[in-house]
From Swiss-Prot:
GO terms for cellular component: cytoplasm; nucleoid. It is found in: Cytoplasm, Nucleoid. InterPro entries: MraZ, MraZ_C, MraZ_dom, MraZ_N, MraZ_sf, SpoVT-AbrB_dom, SpoVT-AbrB_sf. GO terms for biological process: negative regulation of DNA-templated transcription initiation. Belongs to the MraZ family. This is Transcriptional regulator MraZ. The gene is mraZ. Keywords: Cytoplasm, DNA-binding, Repeat, Transcription, Transcription regulation. GO terms for molecular function: DNA-binding transcription factor activity; transcription cis-regulatory region binding. The lineage of its organism: Bacteria, Bacillati, Mycoplasmatota, Mycoplasmoidales, Mycoplasmoidaceae. Forms oligomers. HAMAP family: MraZ.
Length: 145
């Protein structure tokens, strides 16, 4: 399970140092999968979690046009990235641009993945979500989640 929030930054070459606590949760992995997230962030998954994610999409919407389109959009913007000997990953420029990352980032554990957010984008998102936290919890509890 991936948890926690880490303040970090990327360098001028779009490299992110993987925080030691994050690295510890990745185990012996030498690769991670980076893809565009649903909320303007970058998702970082281990191979097993990424494969499960794609399988879940396909199983939910077997053969549907929506499943094909979603799978196409996700896989066309997914990169298998090596964790180098200095525990850094290189984030592709198109993901940097789409996530509006300048320098400062948050790395956020969200159970089966880490999300990489531009600091400014997440600060705005977080501010808007905190006011609805109790509403979201209530709706999910009513639905048995």
């Amino acid at each position: 399970m991936f948890i926690g929030t880490y303040n970090h930054s990327i360098d001028s070459k779009n490299r992110m140092l993987v925080p030691s606590k994050v690295k510890a949760t990745l185990g012996e992995a030498i690769f991670v999968y980076l893809s565009l997230g649903f909320d303007g962030n970058i998702d970082m998954r281990l191979e097993s979690e990424f494969n499960q994610f794609v399988n879940n999409i396909n199983n939910l919407l077997i053969g549907s046009k929506e499943a094909r389109n979603l799978t196409r959009l996700i896989l066309s913007q997914t990169y298998k990235i090596e964790i180098d000997s200095a525990s850094r990953i290189l984030i592709p420029q198109n993901l940097i641009d789409k996530a509006k990352i300048k320098k400062d980032i948050y790395i956020i554990g969200t159970n089966d993945r880490y999300e990489i957010w531009a600091k400014e984008v997440y600060d705005d998102f977080s501010l808007n979500q905190e006011s609805t936290l109790s509403d979201l919890a209530e709706k999910l509890l009513i639905n048995g989640i």
